[in-house]
């Protein structure tokens, strides 16, 4: 069992609330780690929050990876989760390559939106 699974199982067994926060930069990740946040998400919501777009559709893997690298620099205790943005998992080969890239950059959990048209890809992953 991975450290991430062990930590999540422990949190669930203890019955405490899991504290999960979205973060996009190094300075806030330091604070979140110090105050004991359990899970930090680098989400595709950065399209709206950081880039000022109306939705998340313009977010690329490079955008996510940039913010993941900033957040991961200070990761000591929290579980790092990252979204795979739209079009980063359009087929198994693309999804696999992008998920591996996130994992190489200290991401513990890769978050992918389920849709009927990507079910087969998700099952393979």
Mark where each language-model region is.
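N-terminal amphipathic alpha-helix/helix-capping segment at the start of soluble metabolic enzymes
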Residues: 1-22
């Amino acid at each position: 069992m991975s450290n991430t699974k062990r930590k999540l199982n422990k949190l669930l067994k203890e019955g405490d609330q899991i504290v999960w926060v979205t973060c996009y930069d190094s300075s806030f990740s330091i604070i979140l780690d110090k105050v004991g946040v359990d899970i930090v998400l680098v989400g595709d919501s950065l399209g709206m929050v950081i880039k000022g777009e109306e939705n998340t559709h313009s977010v690329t893997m490079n955008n996510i990876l940039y913010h993941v690298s900033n957040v991961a620099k200070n990761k000591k205790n929290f579980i790092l989760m990252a979204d795979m943005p739209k079009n980063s998992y359009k087929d198994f080969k693309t999804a696999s390559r992008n998920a591996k890239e996130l994992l190489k950059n200290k991401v513990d959990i890769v978050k992918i939106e389920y849709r009927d048209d990507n079910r087969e890809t998700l099952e393979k992953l």
